[in-house]
Amino acid sequence: MSVYFDISIDGKPAGRIEFQLFEDVVPKTAKNFRALCTGEQGFGYKGSKFHRVIPQFMLQGGDFTRGDGTGGKSIYGEKFADENFKLKHSEPGLLSMANAGPNTNGSQFFITTVPCSWLDGAHVVFGKVTKNMELVSKIESLGSASGAVKAKVVIEDCGVL
């Protein structure tokens, strides 16, 4: 299954990032992300921002309730359990669930920009970038060691391909 984000940077269109979701390995996690891309439950990623970007690590987004990393919710309720840790953080461009500890998945996700093996067994990998890693790198360059983002990076539109 493929989904997309149409991104703007400081209000200007920046391009589309496409993802493949690994629904064969983590169907529940993939279904949550897909539904948040389509907005079919009445809420989702459209209009939300990347609130935390750390160069040589990752881009984090998906907090569409508070926008600062403290909010978000899943289609299954506020939080849902870690589905499994079969997939590893072995390369750049992987989609993984952000969390606040075991079994606290909501809507926040991150895109890796380097291999992150220290996250294996703690965060659920559920997809990967299939198109436009160049835009991922551009967004990465707007981050900082603290995670503060130097520009407003927004998911203007998103859905299923």
UniProtKB/Swiss-Prot annotation:
It catalyses: [protein]-peptidylproline (omega=180) = [protein]-peptidylproline (omega=0). GO terms for molecular function: cyclosporin A binding; peptidyl-prolyl cis-trans isomerase activity. GO terms for cellular component: cytoplasm. It comes from Rhizopus delemar (strain RA 99-880 / ATCC MYA-4621 / FGSC 9543 / NRRL 43880). It holds the Pfam family Pro_isomerase. PPIases accelerate the folding of proteins. It catalyzes the cis-trans isomerization of proline imidic peptide bonds in oligopeptides. Its main location: cytoplasm. This is Peptidyl-prolyl cis-trans isomerase A2. InterPro entries: Cyclophilin-like_dom_sf, Cyclophilin-type_PPIase, Cyclophilin-type_PPIase_CS, Cyclophilin-type_PPIase_dom. Transmembrane segments: none annotated. Disulfide bonds: none annotated. Keywords: Cytoplasm, Isomerase, Rotamase.
